[in-house]
Curated annotation (Swiss-Prot):
Catalyzes the NADPH-dependent rearrangement and reduction of 1-deoxy-D-xylulose-5-phosphate (DXP) to 2-C-methyl-D-erythritol 4-phosphate (MEP). InterPro entries: DXP_reductoisomerase, DXP_reductoisomerase_C, DXP_reductoisomerase_N, DXPR_C, DXPR_C_sf, NAD(P)-bd_dom_sf. It comes from Symbiobacterium thermophilum (strain DSM 24528 / JCM 14929 / IAM 14863 / T). NADPH binds at residues 11-14, 37-39, 127, 129, 206. Pathway: Isoprenoid biosynthesis; isopentenyl diphosphate biosynthesis via DXP pathway; isopentenyl diphosphate from 1-deoxy-D-xylulose 5-phosphate: step 1/6. This is 1-deoxy-D-xylulose 5-phosphate reductoisomerase. GO terms for molecular function: 1-deoxy-D-xylulose-5-phosphate reductoisomerase activity; manganese ion binding; NADPH binding. It catalyses: 2-C-methyl-D-erythritol 4-phosphate + NADP(+) = 1-deoxy-D-xylulose 5-phosphate + NADPH + H(+).
């Protein structure tokens, strides 16, 4: 029987690559729901190719545009079209799906992920912000419902694979690798342009995660994600800069052995691993040639120039709603940088300033997390930044 798949964020970088994986395994998967924002033309193309029963978009206007496109081209194919928060949750809980790939950007992934877990769906998690903002709620819900949280980030997929069959108590350190971004080795970030920051040396990604990689905030969020996914204290999670991005992460055990996962810089590999789990599907990505590669290098991150890693440790130490505030403030800071409102270094200023103003609520429920998220976004939009 084909595995039913719902994809939240199907028109983004991860979503489109996931559909490519599914296209390469036609006998294994069936797409039952696709959710996107406002890229209705791309969603219409995906819908005509995979013919899911349910489509969801950002709002009623996007739904009307999508419906018009499909009426013109779809023949007898008549999917249900939903929109907004309700549509996203309906896609996440579609009765025919066994696995939900959550690849929407930002904290908007929290509610549909929790809804999917409550509906008993396994989760292929590409939305790290969900665990950053609501890690305790999400992991507790997954454990209570007996569903799997399967990481899609290449680093967390590597850790997941390296931990296979291991006693969690035997872990000494998680070694989380980072490319270092486009500004590795640069001490002065004054004057960094939008174009420079969007030029990642290794990975092709969406704009938000590319900027996060340039500030090392992506790695900061991944530290928090690893903390919740694997139950490892932050002090046992070490970030190591690895410019080649071939060793995707590793686990050091109490006996001194280190187990790592290596592979090409192609997100279709960890996506395929999560979709096929617990099996391994036959690969179609060009395999890694270690002889041609020649050498792998490693170095410490520069936390003075790139303070994001410190912000992550501070957020988890303070606990409660502080990680959600870190995440929300960063999302707005990146938006403001991309819009030309603040300089690149203003991202750090803005995030630190919003965190300084927040008094975290301990052991928050979903309502408290969402309230903190809204507060942080408002604060980040209003906060002045030195130019």
């Amino acid at each position: 029987m084909k595995k039913g798949i719902a994809i939240l964020g199907s028109t983004g970088s991860i979503g489109t690559q996931a559909l490519d994986v599914i296209d390469h395994h036609p006998g294994r998967f069936r797409v039952v729901a696709l959710a996107a924002g406002r890229q209705v033309e791309r969603l219409a193309e995906q819908a005509l190719r995979f013919r899911p029963a349910l489509l969801s978009v950002a709002d009623a206007d996007a739904a009307a545009a999508l419906r018009a496109l499909l009426l013109a081209e779809a023949g007898d194919y008549r999917p249900e079209i939903a929109w907004g928060r309700e549509g996203l949750i309906r896609a996440a809980t579609h009765p025919e799906s066994g696995l939900v790939l959550t690849s929407v950007v930002g904290a908007m992934g929290v509610e549909p992920t929790l809804a999917a877990i409550e509906a008993g769906k396994d989760i292929a998690l590409a939305n790290k912000e969900t665990l950053v903002a609501a890690g305790e709620l999400v992991t507790a819900a997954a454990q209570a419902r007996g569903v799997k949280l399967l990481p899609v980030d290449s680093e967390h997929s590597a850790i997941f694979q390296s931990l296979a069959g291991a006693d969690p108590g035997s872990v000494r350190r998680i070694l989380l690798t980072a490319s270092g971004g486009p500004f590795r080795g640069r001490k002065d970030l004054t004057g960094v342009t939008r174009e420079e920051a969007l030029r990642h040396p290794r990975w092709t990604m969406g704009a938000k995660v590319t900027i996060d990689s340039a500030t090392l905030m992506n790695k900061a969020l991944e530290m928090i994600e690893a903390h919740w996914l694997f139950g490892v204290p932050m002090e046992q999670i070490e970030v190591i800069v690895h410019p080649q991005s071939i060793l995707h992460s590793a686990v050091e055990f109490c006996d001194g052995n280190i187990i790592a996962q290596l592979g090409p810089t192609d997100m279709r590999l960890p996506i395929q691993y999560a979709l096929c789990y617990p099996e391994r599907c036959r690969g179609f990505v060009e395999p890694l040639d270690l002889i041609a590669l020649g050498a792998l290098t490693f170095e410490r991150p520069d936390e003075e120039t790139f303070p994001s890693l410190r912000y992550a440790r501070r957020a988890v130490t303070m606990g409660g709603t502080m990680p959600a505030v870190l995440n929300a403030a960063n999302e707005v800071a990146v938006q403001r940088f991309l819009a030309g409102e603040i300089p690149f270094t203003g991202i750090f200023q803005l995030v630190a300033g919003v965190m300084d103003r927040h008094d975290p609520v301990q052991r928050p429920d979903l309502a408290a997390i969402l309230a903190a998220d809204r507060w942080a976004r408002d604060a980040a939009r209003e906060q002045p930044v030195r130019m």
